[in-house]
């Protein structure tokens, strides 16, 4: 199993339990689905219900959302406007280039060449995107983007993450 973590915060962003596609060698698209889960009662194996106190019974709580977001405890965040998002992208890209120059100089040109196209595309779709940080909620790290696309007549959630802002860990 592979898990991709934010290189700046160490937060888990997604794993290979989902369909993962690399776009222009700079952006991962992670295909999720909308799920609802019941967060029910805890059952203790071996407990004798007749010897226990009467259970008052509670309504089982449910949570629903995108499986990637729920499973990796991503936290929704936002940008006030496109200008604020653009500022974040420029600052984050500078951090990535600096890190690439230190750790992986052969990737710098590919990154710089392809990232401009991807950034223009993201800015054009700004109003259709949701934004998520990792569990630590550190906005200095990677902010993943989520959009919905119509695939085979179904609205499919797709998480977008910058490849160079992640490290792959195998378990």
Curated annotation (Swiss-Prot):
InterPro entries documented for this protein: Mss4-like_sf, Mss4/transl-control_tumour, TCTP, Translation_control_tumour_CS, Translational_control_tumour_p
Function summary: Involved in calcium binding and microtubule stabilization.
UniProt xrefs under PROSITE patterns: TCTP_1 (PS01002), TCTP_2 (PS01003), TCTP_3 (PS51797)
Organism field: Aedes albopictus
Protein name in UniProt: Translationally-controlled tumor protein homolog
GO CC terms: cytoplasm
Subcellular location: Cytoplasm
Encoding gene, per UniProt annotation: Tctp
Main location: cytoplasm
UniProt similarity note: Belongs to the TCTP family.
Keywords, comma-separated and alphabetical: Calcium, Cytoplasm
Alphabetical list of SUPFAM superfamilies matching this protein: Mss4-like
An annotated Gene Ontology molecular function: calcium ion binding
Residue ranges of domain TCTP in the record: 1-171
A Pfam family annotated for this UniProt entry: TCTP
UniProt superkingdom: Eukaryota
């Amino acid at each position: 199993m592979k898990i991709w973590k934010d290189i700046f915060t160490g937060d888990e962003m997604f794993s290979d339990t989902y369909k993962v596609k690399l776009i222009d060698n700079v952006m991962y698209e992670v295909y999720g689905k909308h799920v609802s889960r019941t967060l029910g009662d805890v059952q203790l194996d071996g407990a004798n219900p007749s010897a226990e106190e009467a259970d008052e019974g509670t309504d089982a709580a449910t949570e629903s959302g995108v499986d990637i977001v729920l499973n990796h405890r991503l936290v929704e965040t936002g940008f006030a406007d496109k200008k604020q998002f653009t500022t974040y992208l420029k600052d984050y890209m500078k951090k990535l280039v600096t890190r690439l120059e230190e750790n992986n100089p052969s990737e710098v040109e590919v990154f710089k060449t392809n990232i401009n196209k991807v950034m223009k595309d993201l800015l054009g779709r700004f109003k259709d995107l949701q934004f998520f940080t990792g569990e630590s909620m550190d906005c200095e790290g990677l902010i993943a983007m989520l959009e919905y696309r119509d695939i085979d007549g179904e609205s499919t959630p797709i998480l977008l993450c910058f490849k160079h802002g992640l490290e792959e860990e195998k378990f």
